Regions:
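Phosphate/nucleotide-binding beta-alpha loop and adjacent structural elements of enzyme active sites
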Residues: 1-289
Length: 289
C-alpha cells in the first residue's frame, strides 16, 4: 500500500458519524475520548453545539456539519446535496431518496433542504484515523467504509447500521468490512440498548456507569457482550435475523394485515422491545490486539 494515505491513528479519538442529539458523543466524552462528530441536519447540529458547548470550547469535540456523500466524479464541483429532513422521526434524516420513500411508506414525512457535502476522506486526512468509528447515516454508511480504502491505518473498531431489507446487501457490507481488514464481528440488537450495562472493568478507557437512553448506540469495542465471530459465522447469524425480518420486519408478512400488526404489538409488549428490532454490525480489525 505504498500509495495509501498515511494519516496518523489516534488511540484517544472516536468518530461519531451521525450524531443526532449527541447521545453517543456524550458517552464517548465522559469516558475520556476526544470526538469528531458529524451531523447533516442543521437543527440537530445546532442542538449538539449548544448541548456540548463546554466540550467544544475545551477542544475535546469538533462538530462537522453536513452530509457525507460520494461525488459523482473527480470533476464534480457540487457543494451541496438534497437532504430529506424527517419531520416525524428526526433520526431518519437521509440523503438517500430510496430511504426517504421507504420512510414515507412507514408513515413519516420529510422536508427537502440543501446541506453542505462533507468529504469523509478529507476529514480522516485532517483529523486522523480514530480508535473507533461509529457510523449511522441512514443509507450512506458504506460511503465511509469505501473512503477508508485509501488509508493505510484503519480504526481498531467500527460499527455500521446493518442492512435489513436485502440480504445480498448485508453480505456486501460484511465483504467490504473484510476487504478493509476486519475479521471479527458482532451483531448487536439496537432496540434494547437501554438495558445494556457498562462493564465495571471497562476495556475502553474507564467505566463511568453510563445509563443508555433512546437513540444511543450503546457499548463498543471490547466492552461489547458476546463473542466475536468470523465473516462466515456473522453471515449465518444474519440469516437467522433475516428470517425474522421476513415475518415481522417493515415489509414482513405480518405487517400487511391488521391482525398481523396486532400480533407484533402484543409480542413487543411481552419482550419489552420493538419486534423485530434492528441491528448494528460491529467489527474488529485484524491488526487490533
Amino acid at each position: 500500500m505504498s500509495d495509501a494515505n498515511h494519516a496518523k491513528k489516534h488511540p484517544e479519538l472516536i468518530y461519531d458519524v451521525g450524531m443526532h442529539k449527541g447521545e453517543d458523543t456524550d458517552y464517548y466524552l465522559k469516558k475520556g475520548f476526544s470526538v469528531i462528530g458529524f451531523e447533516a441536519d442543521p437543527d440537530l447540529a445546532a442542538y449538539c453545539r449548544d448541548r456540548l458547548s463546554d466540550e467544544i470550547e475545551n477542544g475535546k469535540l469538533i462538530i462537522v456539519e453536513g452530509a457525507i456523500a460520494e461525488r459523482k466524479s473527480e470533476d464534480d464541483e457540487e457543494r451541496t446535496i438534497k437532504f430529506y429532513k424527517n419531520t416525524s422521526i428526526s433520526v431518519w434524516g437521509t440523503v438517500d431518496a430510496d430511504w426517504a420513500r421507504r420512510n414515507e411508506k412507514l408513515g413519516t414525512s420529510s422536508e427537502v433542504i440543501e446541506v453542505p457535502i462533507v468529504d469523509f476522506a478529507a476529514c480522516l486526512e485532517k483529523h486522523g484515523v480514530p480508535h473507533y468509528c461509529k457510523i449511522d447515516i441512514e443509507g450512506m454508511d458504506a460511503v465511509c467504509l469505501r473512503a477508508l480504502r485509501r488509508f493505510e491505518h484503519k480504526p481498531d473498531y467500527i460499527s455500521i447500521e446493518s442492512e435489513k431489507v436485502s440480504f445480498d446487501k448485508l453480505v456486501e457490507e460484511v465483504n467490504l468490512l473484510s476487504e478493509l481488514g476486519y475479521d471479527r464481528f458482532k451483531a448487536v440488537q439496537q432496540s434494547s440498548i437501554e438495558h445494556q450495562r457498562e462493564p465495571k472493568d471497562s476495556k475502553e478507557r474507564r467505566c463511568v456507569g453510563y445509563q443508555f437512553g433512546m437513540g444511543s448506540s450503546g457499548l463498543f469495542g471490547e466492552d461489547l457482550p458476546g463473542r466475536w465471530m468470523n465473516d462466515e459465522q456473522i453471515i449465518n447469524r444474519y440469516k437467522s435475523v433475516f428470517r425474522r425480518y421476513r415475518v415481522f420486519g417493515d415489509y414482513g408478512i405480518l405487517r400487511k394485515t391488521y391482525p398481523g400488526k396486532a400480533i407484533i404489538k402484543a409480542l413487543s409488549i411481552v419482550v419489552r422491545r420493538p419486534i423485530p428490532g434492528y441491528y448494528d454490525t460491529h467489527a474488529k480489525h485484524t491488526d487490533t490486539c
